[in-house]
């Protein structure tokens, strides 16, 4: 039923057998694969009852982002060991739907630092170990575009971090100075933001200085084999076919077209100033035009499983596909799934490049806004 529709899924890092999903009914459902029932083992109901749109896991802690309700959009932080109520709630970080959440990957140097993005165009770093919202916000940037995805980008060892100069201000008390000089708040590294208009921007998270903004991801068309992007399915710091360390702030994107085709593409800023962006195609996955078992419609989600070296994808055609990057492998069927199809990744015969499509929205199916 509509009231039970789920908006986001994620694994729980502290338990390889558990995963969670956020609901439009305003709760987080937690499942354990070892349980004999298909019912969730836990339901965490948010105090606002607002639909949850995004979720991220950090050990035993879970962060969830809500849809705008009235004038508030909230980030609830849950402790899975005491689930009666969130341990923290931040209601002023964003002023519109919170669409994307991700914790910093370095749990030692930057523990509990949460990156968030929303429809208000803001991209924020928040220290979720601090209860008081005014103290918890580390830095904020404005992309001037409604955001669909944010994340921590890859960067080389030579990356020029924002210099961390100890701050002393006569107007600050000891508490405030201790906060701004917190080592966990410095050298956070670069982040990426992808908008609903299919634009990419790169930022340094310490103060959200812009490295590169307003990059149209549908503009590059000189890929070989030929490929034209319609939308970004998802993004990550590094992809399964990365062959060399990043020379500048970079990230990988899973691109899609209207027919169900996909491509794994990386974008890298050539220097810290981000004047030049280098685009590289690492793989192209066919649609049903070239492979009968591939996707025939828009692809909504992707998940790379490093252990099995498989890429799982789901689309509007109702298919769940398991792809192998080893072209010699036989197709692999996802275990226990229903309505599934399989294929190995192959480079299809080159076909004439299609004319780039006009940007904008299809008013019938909103095909150019896959996150809507």
Model-found features: residue ranges?
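WD40 beta-propeller repeat blades
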Residues: 2-230
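Terminal intrinsically disordered, low-complexity extensions flanking WD-repeat/beta-propeller proteins
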Residues: 145-372
């Amino acid at each position: 039923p509509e009231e039970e529709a789920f908006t986001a899924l994620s694994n729980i890092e502290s338990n390889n057998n558990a995963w969670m999903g956020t609901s439009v009914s305003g709760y987080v459902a937690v499942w354990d694969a070892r349980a004999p029932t298909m019912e969730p083992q836990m339901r965490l109901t948010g105090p606002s009852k607002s639909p949850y749109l995004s979720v991220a896991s950090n050990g035993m802690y879970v962060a969830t982002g809500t849809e705008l309700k009235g004038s508030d959009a909230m980030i609830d932080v849950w402790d899975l060991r005491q689930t009666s109520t969130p341990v923290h709630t931040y209601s002023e970080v964003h002023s519109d739907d919170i669409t994307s959440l991700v914790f910093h990957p370095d749990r030692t140097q930057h523990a509990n630092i949460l990156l968030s993005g929303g429809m208000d165009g803001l991209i924020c770093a928040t220290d979720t170990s601090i209860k008081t919202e005014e103290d918890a916000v580390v830095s904020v940037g404005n992309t001037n575009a409604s955001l669909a995805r944010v994340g921590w980008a890859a960067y080389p060892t030579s990356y020029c971090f924002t210099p961390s100069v100890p701050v002393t201000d006569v107007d600050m008390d000891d508490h405030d100075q201790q906060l701004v000089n917190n080592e966990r708040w410095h050298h956070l590294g670069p982040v990426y933001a992808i908008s609903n208009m299919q634009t990419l921007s790169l930022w340094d998270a310490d103060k959200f200085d812009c490295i590169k903004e307003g990059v149209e991801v549908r503009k590059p068309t000189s890929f070989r084999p030929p490929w034209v992007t319609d939308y970004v399915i998802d993004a990550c710091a590094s992809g399964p076919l990365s062959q060399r360390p990043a020379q500048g702030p970079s990230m990988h994107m899973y691109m899609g077209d209207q027919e169900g085709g996909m491509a794994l593409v990386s974008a890298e800023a050539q220097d810290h100033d981000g004047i030049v962006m280098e685009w590289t195609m690492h793989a192209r996955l066919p649609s049903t035009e070239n492979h009968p078992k591939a996707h025939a419609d828009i692809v909504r989600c992707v998940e790379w499983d490093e252990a099995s070296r498989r890429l799982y994808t789901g689309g509007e055609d109702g298919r769940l596909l398991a792809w192998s990057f080893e072209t010699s492998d036989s197709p692999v069927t996802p275990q226990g799934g229903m309505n599934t199809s399989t294929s190995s990744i192959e480079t299809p015969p080159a076909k004439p490049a299609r004319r780039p499509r006009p940007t904008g929205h299809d008013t019938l199916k909103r095909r150019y806004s896959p996150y809507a």
